[in-house]
Structure formats: C-alpha cells, structure tokens
Amino acid sequence: MLADRATLAPAAFSGDVTAADGISRVEWAVNWPADRDDGFINAYCNTIPTPAGGTHEAGMRTALLKGIKAFGDLTGNRKAAQITAEDVMSGACAMLSIFIADPQFQGQTKDKLVSVDASRLVEQAVKDHFDHWLSARPDSAASLLERFIDRAEERIRRR
C-alpha cells in the first residue's frame, strides 16, 4: 500500500478482530504518509467495495479520533482536544473490510453501507487495538499527535 513512501509510523496500524458472535469480522490497515496530504480509504463490506463509505468508515474514524485524543490526554497535551476526525483522516491511507450478516446498503449500487451496527462493531474492534498500538510506539504516536495538532491549528486559523 505504501511500500515506496516515507510514513509517520514505520509500521502500519493493522489488525483483524472476529466478534463474539463468531460471524462478524473487521480487518484494517492504516498509515499516514510523511510527505503528502492526499489519502484514501478503501472500504469493503462482505468483499463489496463501498466507495461512498458508510457506517463502517464512521466507526473507524471515531475509533482513531478517540484513540489519539486519549493518547494526548495521557501525555498531558491539551491541544489534542481540538483534533477532529477530519484532522486524523486527512492524509491517511487506509484499508477497511468488514464481514457482517445482512448488511444494509444505500441504493441499488451498494456504494454506501448504512448498517447501524457496523459503526459500533468497527469502533469497538479498532479502538482498543489503536490504544495499545500507540502505547507500544511512543515515537510514532508523538509524530501522529503532532501532525494532527498541526492540522487542527491550521483548520482553526482558516476560520
């Protein structure tokens, strides 16, 4: 995905979790290129591409935002409170795939997942893993926090 580019974290944040029901599953990988702001999220539900995103992407955004804010609080960085999901996801290169029973899509083309449970499933799967990932990589976590704070301050200045 990013083999030829410098990234803020030497190792991508990736993982997979099978839910307690034994059916639902979440797989993800995300990293932030050091040199550019153009990112992407390639998301899938039951191997169906969802180019318009949906509730599963919202769950990932929420988990990453909560995780980086918690890390900011843990390190005593008050500026972390101003970070939004857009600050975290702009420039991120991510892959997200979920497998759920009876997915609900918007429209006939299945471009967007609208299953309410997907957001909660992804957030729960990703959040704890991201917290541990940040704790295990303090240098990468500090670089990410600094980047996100810079983005937040830039966004606030533009108002």
Model-derived features with residue positions:
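GHKL-family ATPase ATP-binding module
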Residues: 1-159
